[in-house]
C-alpha cells in the first residue's frame, strides 16, 4: 500500500505542560514501568481498597499506555479523591526533553534527561526515530553509556554511567509517541515525516546506547510491558533486541522475552572481532554462534539478524563474505550490511559502495538476505554507532560489578 508523508515545516517538540516535566531529583515513585502485580501492591500500600485494586490497575494501565496521559488529572473515570491520592504518592511524568534534532531525511533524535537516583546525578540518553516507507522504527537505549568499548562505535567512548530502569526505557517510547502525535486524539506536529495513516511507531529496536543483555531483567520487564496487548500492544515480531554477544543471556532472552534477535557480529574470525568487539575475548565466536543456533523459536519465519559494519580494508573483502557464509551455515538468518557511520575521532573509513554491493552479492547468492542499510540521520549523529551523551562516568568498580553478575550466572 502506498504511504504518503507530511513535509510541513519543522517545529521542535515541547512538553505539553510544564508540570509534566521531571524535576532534577524525583521524590515520588513512578507508576511507569511497574508490572500489573507491582502496581496493584503499590495501590494497596497507599490505601486503595484491595477489592478495587484490579479494577484500578486496569484503568491506570489503559490511561498510561493506550491514552498516553502524563497527568493524573487527565484520567476521567477515576474519582477526584483517588486521583488526589495518586498524585500525592506517585508520578507519571515524562523525562525532560533537553533537545530535539531533525535530520534532512526525517530522522529525529531526542536528548532526554532523567532525574537523579539515590546519590547520583541526572543523566542523559539519546533516542532515535526513523521513518520509513510504511513503518516507523524507534531505537531505544538500555544504558547510559556502554561498557563494551567497541572500537567503531561512538557510544563505546562514553564509559558506562548506569543502567536505565524499566520506567526510563518505556519513557523513551512514551515521549516519542507524544512528540509524533501517536496517541489517540493527538495531533502530529508540523514537519513530522511519518505515515499519515496508522501508527507512527510500528517497530522498536533495542539498538541505542548500551548492551541490553547487561541490563537483562529491566529490559525484559520493559519489553513485556511494551508488548502487552492491553497497553502499548507492540507485536513481539516488531521488537528486536540487539546484543554484541552476551552469550549466557541469549537463549534466556528467547525463552523469557521472545522478541526478535539481532547480533552485532562485524567480523568472521576471533582475531579481528577481539579488536572490533572486545567482549569476543570473553565469549568468542564459537560460543556466540552456538548460542544463536539454540535461540528458542529460531526458524525461517523468525530469523536472527546479524549486523555487519562495513569497514574499508578491515572486514570487507570477498573472502570475508565467503567466510561469513560458512560461519552462519545452517542458521536461519538475515545479514544487515551497515555502511560505517563516522563520528568525531573515529579511526575507520566506510567501505566503498561498490565493494559493499559486491560483498552483498556474494552473501545473497548463498541464499541469505543481505540488505544494505541506508544511513539515516548521519547529519545529526543519529545513525548506527553514533549515539553518545555527556553524562558522568560510572566508577570502574560499578562497571565490573555489572559484568561480573552476568558472567557468573
From Swiss-Prot:
S-adenosyl-L-methionine binds at residues 210-211, 242, 264-266, 341. HAMAP family: RNA_methyltr_RlmN. Belongs to the radical SAM superfamily. RlmN family. It comes from Bartonella quintana (strain Toulouse) (Rochalimaea quintana). The keyword Isomerase does not apply. The gene is rlmN. [4Fe-4S] cluster binds at residues 146, 150, 153. Its main location: cytoplasm. The lineage of its organism: Bacteria, Pseudomonadati, Pseudomonadota, Alphaproteobacteria, Hyphomicrobiales. This is Dual-specificity RNA methyltransferase RlmN. Its EC number is 2.1.1.192. It catalyses: adenosine(2503) in 23S rRNA + 2 reduced [2Fe-2S]-[ferredoxin] + 2 S-adenosyl-L-methionine = 2-methyladenosine(2503) in 23S rRNA + 5'-deoxyadenosine + L-methionine + 2 oxidized [2Fe-2S]-[ferredoxin] + S-adenosyl-L-homocysteine; adenosine(37) in tRNA + 2 reduced [2Fe-2S]-[ferredoxin] + 2 S-adenosyl-L-methionine = 2-methyladenosine(37) in tRNA + 5'-deoxyadenosine + L-methionine + 2 oxidized [2Fe-2S]-[ferredoxin] + S-adenosyl-L-homocysteine. Disulfide bonds join 139-384. It comes from the Bacteria. Reaction proceeds by a ping-pong mechanism involving intermediate methylation of a conserved cysteine residue. One of its GO terms (biological process) is rRNA base methylation.
Amino acid at each position: 500500500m502506498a504511504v504518503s508523508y507530511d513535509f510541513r515545516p519543522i517545529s521542535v517538540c515541547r512538553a505539553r505542560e510544564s508540570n509534566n516535566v521531571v524535576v532534577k531529583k524525583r521524590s515520588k515513585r513512578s507508576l511507569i514501568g511497574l508490572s500489573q502485580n507491582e502496581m496493584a501492591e503499590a495501590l494497596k500500600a497507599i490505601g486503595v481498597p484491595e477489592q478495587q485494586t484490579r479494577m484500578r490497575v486496569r484503568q491506570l494501565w489503559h490511561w498510561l499506555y493506550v491514552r498516553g496521559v502524563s497527568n493524573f488529572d487527565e484520567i476521567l473515570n477515576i474519582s477526584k479523591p483517588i486521583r488526589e491520592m495518586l498524585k500525592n504518592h506517585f508520578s507519571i511524568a515524562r523525562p525532560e526533553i533537553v533537545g530535539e534534532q531533525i535530520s534532512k531525511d526525517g530522522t529525529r533524535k531526542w536528548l532526554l534527561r532523567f532525574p537523579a537516583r539515590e546519590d547520583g546525578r541526572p543523566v542523559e540518553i539519546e533516542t532515535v526515530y526513523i521513518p520509513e516507507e510504511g513503518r516507523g522504527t524507534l531505537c531505544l537505549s538500555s544504558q547510559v553509556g556502554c561498557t563494551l568499548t567497541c572500537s567503531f562505535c561512538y557510544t563505546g567512548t562514553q564509559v558506562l554511567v548506569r543502567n536505565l530502569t524499566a520506567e526510563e526505557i518505556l519513557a523513551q517510547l512514551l515521549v516519542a509517541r507524544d512528540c509524533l502525535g501517536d496517541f489517540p486524539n493527538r495531533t502530529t506536529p508540523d514537519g513530522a515525516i511519518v505515515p499519515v495513516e496508522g501508527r507512527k511507531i510500528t517497530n522498536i529496536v533495542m539498538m541505542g546506547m548500551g548492551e541490553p543483555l547487561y541490563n537483562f531483567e529491566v529490559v525484559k520487564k520493559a519489553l513485556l510491558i511494551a508488548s502487552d496487548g492491553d497497553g502499548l500492544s507492540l507485536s513481539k515480531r516488531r521488537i528486536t533486541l540487539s546484543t554484541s554477544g552476551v552469550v549466557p543471556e541469549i537463549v534466556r532472552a528467547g525463552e523469557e522475552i521472545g522478541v526478535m534477535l539481532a547480533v552485532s557480529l562485524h567480523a568472521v574470525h576471533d582475531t579481528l572481532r577481539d579488536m572490533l568487539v572486545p567482549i569476543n575475548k570473553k565469549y568468542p565466536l564459537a560460543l556466540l554462534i552456538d548460542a544463536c543456533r539454540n535461540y528458542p523459536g529460531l526458524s525461517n519465519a523468525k530469523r536472527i539478524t546479524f549486523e555487519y559494519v562495513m569497514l574499508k580494508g578491515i572486514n570487507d573483502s570477498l573472502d570475508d563474505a565467503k567466510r561469513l557464509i560458512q560461519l552462519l551455515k545452517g542458521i536461519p538468518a538475515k545479514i544487515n550490511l551497515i555502511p560505517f557511520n563516522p563520528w568525531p575521532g573515529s579511526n575507520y573509513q566506510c567501505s566503498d559502495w561498490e565493494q559493499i554491493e559486491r560483498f552483498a552479492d556474494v552473501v545473497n547468492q548463498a541464499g541469505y538476505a543481505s540488505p544494505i542499510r541506508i544511513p539515516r540521520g548521519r547529519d545529526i549523529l543519529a545513525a548506527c554507532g553514533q549515539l553518545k551523551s555527556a553524562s558522568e562516568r560510572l566508577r570502574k568498580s560499578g562497571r565490573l560489578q555489572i559484568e561480573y553478575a552476568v558472567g557468573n550466572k
